């Protein structure tokens, strides 16, 4: 059984809806360096894709186009899981594409949209239309495509159903005793999700985050 893991470094929240927002600009150019490819948008934001392995992608969205960390990761010990060789970007009129033996990564230029497929062209992950990355004042939101038969498992010690679909959870520790069977947040945040399409997401983010799986 093959699994694909996508790692996220972003100031964001996953949602299905929101109020008035500004979407990101269109993708205009890119640079590549070793394992990483950085795509630049015409609103000064940027998104960086780093191939940790042939089936693992680190996705880092930066609203200001800067990719500087204040501290080393508290969770990821080693990003480079295996040799991926030289990363090549195939530029087409409407998109950029990156291929590995296991993945096809597509970056649509206008509107900006990120999609990841397996080697059989089955869609594993996709931004929702042109709303993949949204700014709403100080809030940053991420909208992803939710399929009718998609289910989510994980997030560690959380209340509620084993299948997280239809629920919303906060990633913000709260050491509250005597909690109920449906209370959230709790004392620990483990932002790792296993998805029924045989892929997984790890969200590395120190900001207060809400994961919303409502249909």
Question: PLM ranges: what are they?
Answer:
Residues 19-215:
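N-terminal accessory segment at the very beginning of proteins
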């Amino acid at each position: 059984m093959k699994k694909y893991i996508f790692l996220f470094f972003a100031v964001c929240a996953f949602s299905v809806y929101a109020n008035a927002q500004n979407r990101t600009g269109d993708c205009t150019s890119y640079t590549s360096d070793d394992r990483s490819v950085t795509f630049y948008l015409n609103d000064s934001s940027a998104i960086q894709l780093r191939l940790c392995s042939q089936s693992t992608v680190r996705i880092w969205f930066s609203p200001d186009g800067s990719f500087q960390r204040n501290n080393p990761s508290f969770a990821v010990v080693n990003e480079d899981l295996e040799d991926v060789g030289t990363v090549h970007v195939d530029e087409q009129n409407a998109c950029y594409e990156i291929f590995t033996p296991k993945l096809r990564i597509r970056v649509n230029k206008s509107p900006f949209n990120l999609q990841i497929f397996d080697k059989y062209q089955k869609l594993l992950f996709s931004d929702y239309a042109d709303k993949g990355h949204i700014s709403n004042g100080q809030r940053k939101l991420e909208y992803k495509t939710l399929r009718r038969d998609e289910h989510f498992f994980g997030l560690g010690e959380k209340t509620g159903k084993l299948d997280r679909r239809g629920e919303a959870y906060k990633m913000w520790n709260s050491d509250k005793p005597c909690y109920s069977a449906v209370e959230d947040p709790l004392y620990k945040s483990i932002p790792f999700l296993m998805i029924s399409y045989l892929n997984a997401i790890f969200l590395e983010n120190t900001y207060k985050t809400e994961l919303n799986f409502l249909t």
